[in-house]
Curated annotation (Swiss-Prot):
Residues 1-18 form the signal peptide. Disruption phenotype: Affects hydrophobicity only when HfbC, HfbE and HfbF are also deleted. Disruption of all 7 hydrophobins leads to altered germination kinetics, decreased survival under exposure to extreme cold stress and increased mycotoxins patulin and citrinin production. Keywords: Cell wall, Disulfide bond, Secreted, Signal. This is Unclassified hydrophobin D. Disulfide bonds join 35-86, 42-83, 43-49. It is found in: Secreted; Secreted, Cell wall. Aerial growth, conidiation, and dispersal of filamentous fungi in the environment rely upon a capability of their secreting small amphipathic proteins called hydrophobins (HPBs) with low sequence identity. Class I can self-assemble into an outermost layer of rodlet bundles on aerial cell surfaces, conferring cellular hydrophobicity that supports fungal growth, development and dispersal; whereas Class II form highly ordered films at water-air interfaces through intermolecular interactions but contribute nothing to the rodlet structure.
Length: 105
């Protein structure tokens, strides 16, 4: 059930982040591609131009995370939980539950 709630929240976030003015973004370049000095333009929300390429965008604490940022956070969280499970499984006397570990002291 939690999985479906997270999936629904991510879908809603991705839909909210989509720019409704796609025509204005048609000539925009992707990160690392040419921008103002080249054939493409830097676009709002993508970062700034540094030299002839789009630089990485700096985020502020008041700004909502991007879909890419949320995906990275979920990936790191998944790895952390997987690692935590590995740590418990290596504990002598571990039976698959944390309760015996808590009651042993």
């Amino acid at each position: 059930m939690k999985f479906y709630i997270v999936l629904l929240a991510l879908a809603a976030f991705a839909m909210a982040e989509a720019d409704p003015n796609l025509e204005a973004r048609a000539g925009c370049s992707q990160k690392g591609k040419y921008c103002n000095g080249g054939t493409f333009l830097c676009c709002p929300g993508q970062g700034s131009c540094k030299g002839n390429q789009i630089a990485k965008k700096k985020y502020s604490a008041s700004e909502a995370p991007s879909t890419e940022g949320v995906q990275r956070l979920l990936l790191v969280t998944g790895y952390a939980l997987e690692c935590l499970g590995c740590l418990f499984s290596q504990t002598p006397g571990y039976s698959g539950s944390v309760l015996p570990l808590l009651n042993s002291h």
